Amino acid sequence: MTRSDVIAAIATPPGRGGIGVVRVSGRNLQSLALKVAGCVPEPRRASLTRFRDENDRVIDQGIALYFPAPQSYTGEEVLELQGHGGPAVMNLLLASCLSAGARLAQPGEFTLRAFLNNKLDLAQAESVADLIDASTEEAARCAIRSLQGEFSNAIHTSVQALTDLRMLVEASLDFSEEEIEFISGRELEFRLEHIRQQLEQVFSAARQGSLLREGIWIALVGQPNVGKSSLLNRLAGEEVALVTEVPGTTRDVIRQVIEIEGVPMHLLDTAGLRETEDAIEKMGMARTRSTIDKASIVLLLVDSRVGITPEDQAILASLPPGLRLIVVHNKTDLLESPPNSTVSTATATADIWVSAKTGAGIGSLQQGLLEMIGWQPSTGEGAFMARQRHLSALTAARTHLEAACALANSLDQVELFAEELRLAQLALSSITGEFSADDLLGEIFSRFCIGK
């Protein structure tokens, strides 16, 4: 694969649709445009034309758009051919482009070229895929903020502050024998604290964005017939799981995605845990335990009329250590006066009293889930769509900055101090792609859809 040849791909989803788009990018597209569209469209103006195959037979009639370099998505010449969105028509139109000299684009190659041509930085490029994959409105808003450069601008601000500070520190090293004070101790302390505060704000916004992107996985566990499926249906707002009076009805894991304040919640209704000789039910319980291992939060449902039983205690004892846990006391509609719900973020535990039948206490459960994951609505409104690699880079930058702060007052440790600043800057620069290995770029863009 080269980065200067002509590439083409169907840019719209597979299947039938009113409109389908074939996108072409590269150099000297006039020849291809003449062969396929019969004309070279006027830049940035829609041209109605007939599309033809390699034997000059008419494939379709549609719109051709031409964007000259560098005023295009990729920074190269771009030709977009809009035809009727049937699979046969789109495949014929793509084949015509390939026979005219293009090759099939790799997944994410259009956006990769936009990155390589400085139309987008790496964080913005990733936000393109995140915007396409957004499962909630808030996640989509968060992704567009990153695409517009808000995340990148915040990173650039911290990188520039580190660059300015490094310049003064490096000057002190280069002219250590001269009686010149390039930066005072007070100024150094002020700048370090300012950068630290900047990083904390960026990390907080990025973490909120990560919740919007990844969501949270929640396993509903408990003994048979305590209301797990009823609670799933109540949270989902529809009947997605069968509810009966017969214990052991749920044999497999049922997954349902809901959103609470824009945060995707992946609910996993599991088979009830109990002693049984039923082979199929045993298989369901084995899947339940596997699901628990993958979950971020476990909702342990118990019957509020009897409280936590020895069987429930056995389930609690089998949970992985450190797992966030909410004990959901269900069927409060059968109690005269249920206790108040409590949430402890310090211990990552909560006791919530609900009625899956009437909906009482469901609001408290939803808020408890948000508190448990550390969701902050005020921060979420300005969140950046962040991936795990972004959080890892920010964490590394914070670690190196803390190490630099610890060395700031050691006159004989100036070189180590300067190195920690450099490493912090390097970690931040990897987010926007100012410093990124080729294998990282390949990993990122390979996850895009073809045609983007």
From Swiss-Prot:
This is tRNA modification GTPase MnmE. Residues 215-374 form the TrmE-type G domain. Belongs to the TRAFAC class TrmE-Era-EngA-EngB-Septin-like GTPase superfamily. TrmE GTPase family. Mg(2+) binds at S229, T250. GO terms for biological process: tRNA methylation; tRNA wobble uridine modification. The keyword Ligase does not apply. The gene is mnmE. It is found in: Cytoplasm. InterPro entries: G_TrmE, GTP-bd, GTP-bd_TrmE_N, GTPase_MnmE, MnmE_dom2, MnmE_helical, P-loop_NTPase, Small_GTP-bd. Exhibits a very high intrinsic GTPase hydrolysis rate. Involved in the addition of a carboxymethylaminomethyl (cmnm) group at the wobble position (U34) of certain tRNAs, forming tRNA-cmnm(5)s(2)U34. PANTHER family: TRNA MODIFICATION GTPASE GTPBP3, TRNA MODIFICATION GTPASE GTPBP3, MITOCHONDRIAL. The keyword Flavoprotein does not apply. K(+) binds at N225, T244, V246, T249. Transmembrane segments: none annotated. Its cofactor is K(+). GTP binds at residues 225-230, 244-250, 269-272. Its EC number is 3.6.-.-. Binds 1 potassium ion per subunit. Keywords: Cytoplasm, GTP-binding, Hydrolase, Magnesium, Metal-binding, Nucleotide-binding, Potassium, tRNA processing.
